[in-house]
């Protein structure tokens, strides 16, 4: 199921778009406030963001900029601003498409299909700018490839695959080292430290959070 976040302060318009997208079998969340929308965009994974520009508290350009720093997920801007420099600004801030209001809903649906088609089909996870390419067995941050051992890679991947879900040390041990492993659970802590040290130069070490007494989670 494709998950879409709409950040739009015109509630009637947002609701109309939501109904149309739901009819097309998309899952939709709506926020009418810029700050709340940004918080949601950065805390929950989506497949597409639809942003208005003129929003309370934080404008759409700033939301677009901050999302683009964290992920390559498609962004479509919908706005009444029709000047060329507004369109250029939106695209320069990282938007994939820009639609001027009022628009026909069929055009929006077509543009959504188009940007989603451009997304690669390969097995790639994007966690706050940490790009994990399973096919290529490669991890990059800000364009720089991380030199990881197989165990470090497997550990990072299993955390990323279970993003926002706290994993117990025993669960991690089973996934990375195997069910019949005689490795102690404190080895998980050691490898988490290795990973954080390699992410630290890119200020990404805090992406892996410790849940005291339980285990770890990546957000």
UniProtKB/Swiss-Prot annotation:
DNA-binding region location: 122-219
Broad class of the protein's primary localization: cytoplasm
Modified residues (4-aspartylphosphate): 52
Source domain of life: Bacteria
UniProt record, GO biological process: regulation of DNA-templated transcription
Gene3D superfamilies according to UniProt: 3.40.50.2300, 6.10.250.690, Winged helix-like DNA-binding domain superfamily/Winged helix DNA-binding domain (1.10.10.10)
All residue ranges annotated as the Response regulatory domain in the record: 3-116
Subcellular locations according to the entry: Cytoplasm
Signal sequence segment: none
Cellular component terms (Gene Ontology): cytosol; protein-DNA complex
Keywords: Cytoplasm, DNA-binding, Phosphoprotein, Transcription, Transcription regulation, Two-component regulatory system
CDD domains attached to this UniProt entry: trans_reg_C
Changes after translation: Phosphorylated by ArlS.
Keyword GTP-binding recorded: no
GO molecular function: phosphorelay response regulator activity; transcription cis-regulatory region binding
Function: Member of the two-component regulatory system ArlS/ArlR.
Protein name: Response regulator ArlR
Organism field: Staphylococcus epidermidis (strain ATCC 12228 / FDA PCI 1200)
Taxonomic lineage from the root: Bacteria, Bacillati, Bacillota, Bacilli, Bacillales
Gene it is expressed from: arlR
